[in-house]
Design a protein with these regions (language model features):
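Active-site loops and adjacent core secondary-structure elements that bind or stabilize anionic groups
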Residues: 1-246, 254-257
Length: 257
């Protein structure tokens, strides 16, 4: 009787199947986000990339954005773990890997199974039997509840941190668009690539987030940013002034002047 301490089925390794062009990367991520949540959620991603393209970011910055934004949107939370366990490929992998009658044991850190070690104060996982597969299947069907008021995981520490980091990154995208120049391109590309440094779960992830936030502050404080912002503002103001003059000229011409 074999016992399998199962781990969630992992997404296809991008190291082996990495899309080469920016458009291919975006298309792949849109497909993944549609499966992760829904088409509207994937649209949020694609619309941001379109905005960044139109904003003048170069290829390297757009690639960093395409990967970084996806990583923060597609957080592997309780709903995603349930979806991965519910995929037919998980059962197929078990059948191909093990012979005989399997006994599955799931180590679950989320409420209501997880807890805190009384000695170390660190999170610990609880065990659940094979009946969890049915629970995962039910969760996968209702993953649209993620982030809503009835999401039982919405206010746990990891979910709150994920929302904070995502909001900060979206602010960084706005920052990059308003401060973009030839002199700031490399710094802003590094800023948009910071999510690649965030890994793990629990206290490990918190440590990586803290390190990324420190680097974020350093990059945003680069003296070249204020120069680029002032220059971009002047260009924008000039365009608006010319457009206003053109509209005034059209009104004058149409009135018979």
């Amino acid at each position: 009787r074999a016992q399998a301490l199962a781990n969630p089925v992992q997404p296809v390794a991008l190291a082996d199947h990495r899309a080469k062009t920016l458009d291919e990367v975006i298309a792949h991520r849109v497909s993944e986000l549609t499966d992760y949540r829904n088409a509207a959620f994937a649209g949020r991603y694609s619309q941001m990339l379109t905005r960044a393209k139109e904003g003048g970011l170069n290829e390297a910055a757009l690639m960093a954005l395409a990967r970084g934004y996806y990583k923060l949107l597609a957080v592997k939370d309780e709903w995603e773990v349930a979806r991965l366990y519910s995929k037919p490929s998980f059962r197929e992998a078990l059948a191909q890997t093990f012979d005989g009658d399997l006994k599955l044991t799931f180590h679950v850190g989320a409420w209501p199974f997880g807890g805190v070690d009384k000695v170390t104060g660190k999170p610990v996982k609880g065990e659940a039997g094979p009946w969890m597969l049915k629970a995962f299947g039910l969760m996968a069907r209702f993953r649209g509840l993620r982030g809503t008021l009835v999401d039982p995981f919405r206010n746990n520490a990891e979910a709150r941190l994920a929302r904070e980091v995502l909001a900060e990154y979206e602010a960084d995208i706005d920052f990059a668009l308003s401060h973009w120049s030839a002199d700031t391109a490399s710094t802003l590309t590094e800023l948009l690539a910071l999510p690649e440094q965030i890994r793990g779960y629990g206290h490990v992830r918190e440590r990586h987030v803290a390190q990324a936030r420190q680097r974020r502050a350093e990059l945003r404080a680069d003296p070249a940013m204020s120069v680029a912002a002032a220059w971009n503002w002047a260009l924008s103001a000039g365009r608006q002034h010319r457009q206003a003059d053109a509209r005034q000229h059209d009104r004058t011409s149409n009135s018979g002047g």
